[in-house]
Amino acid sequence: MARYIGPKAKLSRREGTDLFLKSARRSLADKCKLDSKPGQHGRTSGARTSDYGTQLREKQKVKRIYGVLERQFRRYFAEADRRKGNTGENLLKLLESRLDNVVYRMGFGSTRAEARQLVSHKAITVNGVVANIPSLQVKAGDVIAVREQAKKQARILEALSLAEQGGLPQWVAVDSKKFEGTFKSMPERSDIAGDINESLIVELYSR
């Protein structure tokens, strides 16, 4: 399955909630009707969604939020299930500790897609070493930084400004003047914002 490159707002409308796929410069709710499905007049149906359909939609929503394809998502779930603790929470923690997501959470990219591009274009270092794999798992204590030649990019400066206005997660510490941040610890479930019901995904894969 190829990565989706179409309109980001369409995906949020499909899920009926803002997936934060676009910059926070303007609220997505101001741009489109999130309660209206994609299509000229919005797709309507009187049929009740089945339990399976609800579970599948939740999985699709989380995949789209983090920009992960099906095969990779299955691997994340298998690893989450293998680890001790709550499988659903483990899954979200694995997704949150992806390098592209951490770059986004630190405010170096205004969206996860932009953060993923920064990583792919070798604009990011981890502990002083260039890292260009978006799915790299970041560990507690790792230092993430913007490379010197990328510090003047307008999109990074703008993203940092937006992040400072909106606030940063407690599990990262960022020095915006140095363009670097520290992944202090794995986030707790309560630290992960967003309208996500991970238990539905666990139920889906438990069928």
From Swiss-Prot:
GO biological process, one term: translation
Gene Ontology CC: small ribosomal subunit
Domain S4 RNA-binding: 97-160
Residue spans of biased composition, Polar residues class: 42-53
InterPro entries linked to this entry: Ribosomal_uS4, Ribosomal_uS4_bac-type, Ribosomal_uS4_CS, Ribosomal_uS4_N, S4_RNA-bd, S4_RNA-bd_sf
Pfam families linked: Ribosomal_S4 (PF00163), S4 (PF01479)
Residue segments, region Disordered: 31-55
Keywords: Ribonucleoprotein, Ribosomal protein, RNA-binding, rRNA-binding
Taxonomy, superkingdom: Bacteria
UniProt GO molecular function: rRNA binding; structural constituent of ribosome
Quaternary state and interactors: Part of the 30S ribosomal subunit. Contacts protein S5. The interaction surface between S4 and S5 is involved in control of translational fidelity.
Role noted for this protein: One of the primary rRNA binding proteins, it binds directly to 16S rRNA where it nucleates assembly of the body of the 30S subunit.
Family listed: Belongs to the universal ribosomal protein uS4 family.
Listed name of the protein: Small ribosomal subunit protein uS4
Source organism: Paraburkholderia phymatum (strain DSM 17167 / CIP 108236 / LMG 21445 / STM815)
Taxonomic path: Bacteria, Pseudomonadati, Pseudomonadota, Betaproteobacteria, Burkholderiales
